[in-house]
């Protein structure tokens, strides 16, 4: 009876091993796969199996745990497998699984290190399924590590191995990767599939009217008839080609003509109308502009009925936050609307609503991008007390910590008299005791300071940093530190501070800016940001559908480089400058 049981056990083990392996070749070894047995059954059998058989069983058990979402257990089981003693097929399986587990921990570098294994030279000899699995995780790891072009190249490599839904998913991933590349990396140097993808992305990113962009895509297809993307366009381009090229003939400009926002509305209106005048001067067919007074609105639905009856195709405005909130909670709007403010909700509003403003949150994100591009890791933050400072800090924290950075200290500033103590606390400044001539010590783990403050406060902060032995710590600020007043004494007090700012205030040679400041001198100062926003609202008006169809597209405006989020909010990326010798010195743009 015992002999029979042993024989039965042997047969079961053989069947289980057969279910756990496929055999590419005798030299490569058997490739594990997940059988119908449970993890516990696989591990139980592995405990009494021969070493090679046990390794197959444990690899299958680890793979099954990973597929069930138990990454910790998968890693624990995988750790019991002696990878160096395995045959190449099993090694590739093991390092692929190890890379997948590393990505669940958001550790792209560990994933790439795992895949940098000698056995990978045999990958092309394995079944297609394993080639696809290994190359897919490598592409994901490269993308997570910021190696966007290499990730696209890896996905292009496996594209011929795929079909059906997998092929479509991979093709959309390739498109998203090449569209994330900066323009200088889109210059195709070959006629292979990668070169075709790069030139298609360049065509899609080249600014122009809807008609021009559609023609650029058609020209690309004619030049690359056998390219995979010509046979099946990415979904974004399908949407773009299906947009109706309908001219925009009439815009309603909805702004308050009385109340506390009159001066803001005036600057927006003058910037908007100046942009229309410039378009007419350059020979463009400009839409008619009809101005409506939002301060007189008692019923927003009545306004839309009036606008529709007047033949309006697009509403630009309102500016008032309460009216934007009303629009944001509606299911539909009668007309496409570019609001000149943001609702408080982060959720998308009705499909016809777009929101645009000079959000301080955009600038907080810009500081995070810049500091990250400059290779910095640990931040301290100085923001004003109150709701505005809390919002700016929250936006910076979300972006900075989301990208792997750390915030070591936060100070909420208010009164200049308290700055010395606040900065001393932030840097944990310690006195030199009784040692004559010794320099006080401070913490050394702060790479830079994120600053959101008025010019008057900022010009107190930088000298105080110098006094508190922290003058060499870089300061990255929002535009709020810049008064654009030309006050050299103030600029000297802020020497070394880097800040993001609108092109309007930094590029003083811009033709539209020169026209506007000649007529309205106040536009040369801090109020110029609103003139820039008004001009950009005109620029955005005919291109909203394009930005919606191609979220990676950007419009180079005077308030920043403009793109659209998934919630149809216009987001700005800004150029940079630095206070230097009582002047404002333009810095190179942030690498994107």
Feature names for model-found ranges:
Residues 279-294, 350-354, 401-422:
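Short beta-strand elements in bilobed, periplasmic/extracellular small-molecule ligand-binding domains
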Residues 16-36:
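Bacterial Sec signal peptide processing site at the extreme N-terminus
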Residues 518-586:
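Segments of small-molecule ligand-sensing domains
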């Amino acid at each position: 009876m015992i002999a029979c049981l042993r024989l039965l056990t042997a047969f079961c083990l053989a069947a289980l091993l057969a279910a756990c392996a496929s055999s590419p070749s005798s030299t490569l070894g058997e490739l594990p796969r997940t059988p119908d047995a449970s993890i516990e059954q696989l591990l139980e059998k592995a405990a009494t199996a021969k070493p090679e058989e046990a390794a197959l069983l444990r690899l299958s058990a680890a793979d099954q745990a990973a597929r069930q979402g138990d990454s910790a257990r998968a890693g624990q089981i995988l750790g019991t497998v002696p990878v160096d003693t395995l045959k190449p097929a099993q090694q590739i399986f093991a390092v692929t699984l190890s890379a997948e587990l590393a990505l669940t921990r958001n550790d792209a570098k560990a994933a790439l290190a795992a895949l940098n294994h000698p056995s990978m030279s045999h990958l092309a000899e394995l079944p297609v399924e394993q080639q696809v699995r290994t190359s897919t995780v490598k592409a994901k790891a490269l993308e997570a590590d910021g190696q966007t072009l290499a990730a696209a190249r890896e996905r292009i490599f496996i594209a011929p191995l795929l079909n059906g839904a997998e092929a479509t998913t991979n093709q959309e991933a390739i498109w998203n990767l090449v569209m994330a590349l900066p323009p200088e990396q889109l210059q195709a140097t070959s006629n292979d599939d990668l070169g075709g993808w790069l030139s298609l992305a360049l065509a899609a990113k080249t600014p122009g009217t809807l008609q021009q962009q559609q023609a650029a895509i058609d020209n690309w297809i004619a030049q690359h008839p056998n390219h995979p993307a010509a046979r099946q366009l990415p979904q974004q381009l399908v949407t773009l080609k299906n947009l109706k090229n309908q001219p925009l003939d009439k815009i309603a400009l909805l702004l308050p003509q009385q109340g506390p926002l009159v001066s803001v509305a005036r600057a927006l209106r003058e910037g908007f109308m100046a942009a229309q005048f410039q378009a007419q001067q350059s020979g463009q067919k400009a839409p008619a502009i009809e101005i409506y007074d939002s301060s007189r609105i008692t019923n927003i639905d009545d306004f839309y009925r009036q606008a529709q009856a007047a033949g309006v195709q697009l509403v630009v405005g309102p500016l008032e936050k309460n009216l934007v909130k009303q629009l944001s909670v509606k299911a539909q709007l009668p007309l496409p609307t570019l609001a000149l403010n943001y609702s408080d909700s982060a959720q998308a509003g009705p499909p016809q609503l777009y929101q645009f403003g000079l959000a301080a949150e955009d600038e907080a994100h810009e500081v995070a991008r810049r500091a990250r591009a400059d290779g910095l890791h640990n931040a301290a933050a100085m923001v004003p007390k109150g709701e505005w400072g809390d919002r700016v800090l929250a936006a910076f924290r979300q972006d900075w910590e989301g990208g792997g950075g750390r915030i070591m200290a936060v100070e909420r500033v208010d009164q200049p008299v308290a700055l010395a103590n606040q900065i001393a606390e932030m840097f944990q400044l310690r006195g030199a005791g009784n040692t004559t001539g010794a320099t006080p010590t401070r913490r050394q783990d702060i790479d830079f300071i994120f600053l959101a403050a008025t010019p008057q406060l900022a010009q107190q902060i930088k000298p105080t940093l110098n006094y508190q032995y922290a003058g060499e710590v870089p300061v990255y600020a929002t535009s709020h530190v810049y008064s654009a007043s030309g006050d050299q004494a103030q600029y000297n007090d802020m020497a070394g501070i880097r800040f993001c700012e609108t092109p309007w205030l930094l590029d003083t040679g811009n033709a539209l800016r020169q026209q506007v400041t000649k007529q309205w001198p106040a536009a040369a100062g801090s109020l110029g940001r609103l003139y820039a926003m008004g001009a950009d609202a005109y620029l955005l008006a005919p291109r909203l559908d394009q930005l919606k169809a191609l979220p990676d597209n950007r419009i180079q405006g005077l308030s920043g480089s403009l793109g659209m989020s998934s919630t149809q909010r216009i987001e700005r990326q800004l150029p940079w400058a630095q206070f230097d010798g009582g002047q404002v010195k333009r810095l190179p743009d942030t690498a994107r």
